[in-house]
Amino acid sequence: RSRGLGDVYKRQVRNHLFDQRRAVMVHWLILLNVVIFILGFFFQVDIPRNIYPPVHLDLIQLYGAYSEYTCFHEGELWRLLTYQFLHANLGHIMFNMIALWFFGPVVEERFGHGRFLLYYLFCGVAAALFSSLLGDMGFFDPEWRFIPMVGASGSIYGIMAACAVLFPHARVQLLFPPVNLSVRQFALAVLGVAAAVIIFQWNNAGGEAGHLGGMFAGFILTLLILWKEKLSSPRRKDASSSHYSPEPSSRRP
């Protein structure tokens, strides 16, 4: 019998909750981000003008946020990783962690725990580098290279890209606007928004460049993973079949 849309939603929710129980890395990432965000409230500082443009950060962000200047001109390369676990405000971390909780488990289940973590971190690094690349190409004000960048958004957008490749026809119900989209349509929509913000130089164009970089990196990396799996699968089949060598039949016609 045909299933109604309500049945589809129930099945998706049931499957998602089942995936959540096995999403070990997603749970640890969410916990780590939340703990670091809370700790930041106890270490509030004002940034001197000769280090950054006038902004207000906490002490953890001061030594963990990414900027092109501090990372490459001062050699603090660890910022490519640490900035991914820092967030600007409550809304920022809530959006990212909800998205990680929603999209992350199915990708972790597909990739495995270790490979998922490496994928997550790689997309975050690619997001920062892509943002700096566009800045060096003149898309943003030269001051951009000094402005601290924080957030897991680049990694999250990379996970969205993986979902769009692996599960393109899965459905996403948005609350605002209240529309139902496939994961592929949703990924293309957020990709279009990020591109428009960069092209028209709207607010947070540099941050949207990071989103775009994370999504591009995730798309390419997911395709490479699938390609590698496709190449190795015939070898696994050959190896398994080589263990079985039936004896020739003793019967004669």
Language-model segments: what does each one mean?
Residues 2-6:
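Positively charged, low-complexity/disordered segments
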Residues 104, 162-166, 218-226:
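Hydrophobic transmembrane alpha-helices
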Residues 7-34, 38, 44, 194-253:
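C-terminal transmembrane module of polytopic alpha-helical membrane proteins
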Residues 38-56:
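Helix-to-loop transition at the C-terminal end of transmembrane segments
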Residues 109, 166-181, 226-235:
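Alpha-helical transmembrane bundle and helix-membrane interface signal
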Residues 16, 76, 80-163, 199-213:
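Transmembrane helix-loop-helix
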Residues 50-85:
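Extracytosolic (periplasmic/ER-lumenal) interhelical loops and adjacent juxtamembrane/interface segments
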